[in-house]
Amino acid sequence: MEVTPMAGTPAALIHPSRIPNRWLQLIAGIVAMMAIANLQYAWTLFTKPIQAHLHVSLEAVQVTFFIFVALETWLVPFEGFLVDLIGPRFMLGIGSILVGLGWIGSGRAETIGSLYFWYGVGGVGAGIVYGGAIGNALKWFPDYRGLCVGLTAAAFGIGTATTIAPIADMLKVSGYQHTFIVWGLIQGFVVLASSLFLARPPVGWTPPNWKEKEAKIKAKVNTSAVDMTPLQMLCQPSFYIIYVMMTMLAFGGLVVTAQLNPMAASYHVDKVVVLWGMTALVVAITVDRILNGLTRPFWGWVSDHIGRENAIFISFILEALAVYALLQLIGHPVWFVALSGLCFFAWGNIFSLFPSITGDLYGKKWATTNYGIVYTAKGVAAAFAGPGAAWLFAKTGSWTKVFWAMIVCDLIAAFMALLWLKPLAARAVRASNQTALGAGVPISVKARGVA
């Protein structure tokens, strides 16, 4: 469990020198997130080798992806509650063991059922790491919430960029089973080492010069003065709008994440060499992961300045345009690389904007648990993006209808953010802040201010 000089102790009773450096907390969370990225973002490289070895269909293989994402997301509310209760160090230590076992077990699986089980174990571990790292960033950085949550989420998006080439090479030389085992050991160890540096903020802790920062921050983000419990959050209409939006927006990126290899093969660009001896597929995955990482702090920073809902609207109009262009030009290797990258640049920000909006509207005390509930929407989306998209392709013999489903979801959610969520969130924040004032609760930031 978390053993620190400040665990459960009011901040006022702790000498400043004994409070952990919050930037070290951020770095440790980033490293842990990078170490779990391969479980999701390198998956597409394993699909065809697994098909060949286990003699199963693409739909059956992609059920593995759904199980991983479902367990990575649907257990996060409970895991987040444990992180809030026990602390991130102990919980991420448990997560590191599960992450390692997930890929090691997958490497030894000789049936599709055992692959489902072991990849699911990895999903549980990844969920602990993801929820714990994001929750810690929310708590340590109320003054830079969008940026620092974005940086943490970016690590999950960009982590595979540095490993995709060696993983692809190892797959060719040693096969997917050996690759799973070796990288499972590496990833588990890195998460374990990172977890040793993590700790919760002391009770009542605020960043340096917090009062001065509050006074200077312009009114750009809907921010509640009330820390809502998960049950209170579930009573808010805004939660259900956020959940539906998260589901629709997660769908598009998860389709490309899971199906990029089969898509490239369908359009005959998977083996075309485009750069330094690397195929269009490997280059695309590398570029995608880099942009998928960079987009998260970028749009987090943008949302700190123009508001979360405005950032969602702009980015997902861009996403819809990028998906449409990819549909038209996917058979050209260079455009395949460039436009799949643009899709990820417009998509990956949901993992910085939605945690930030959750913290803004429902407070930071239960931020890990509350965002964990919102994050389960990714698991719902995975059912449609993994086996669902593979089934639609098998039935139609084309990816066209899958692309159009992505475009429609992006456009609907973008307009929901601007026309529905934005005014509803503003009204809800005003009401909660008035309630807090009436109850004598100190309000650090009024409605439309940044927490």
Regions found by a protein language model. Name each.
Residues 41, 69-77, 161, 289-297, ...:
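Residue-level signature of mid-helix packing/kink "hotspots" within the transmembrane helices
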Residues 43-48, 231-299, 385:
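Extracytoplasmic gate region of multi-pass secondary transporters
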Residues 50, 128-141, 149, 349-362:
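Intracellular juxtamembrane helix-capping segments at the cytosolic ends
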Residues 50-51, 82-83, 162, 166-174, ...:
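Interfacial helix-cap and linker-helix signal at transmembrane-aqueous boundaries
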Residues 74-112, 303-309:
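Conserved MFS/SLC helix-loop-helix module at the cytosolic interface between two early adjacent transmembrane helices
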Residues 102, 113-121, 334-342:
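Paired small-residue
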Residues 156-203:
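Helix-loop-helix hairpin linking two adjacent transmembrane segments in secondary transporters
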Residues 279-357:
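C-terminal transmembrane helical hairpin of 12-TM major facilitator-type secondary transporters
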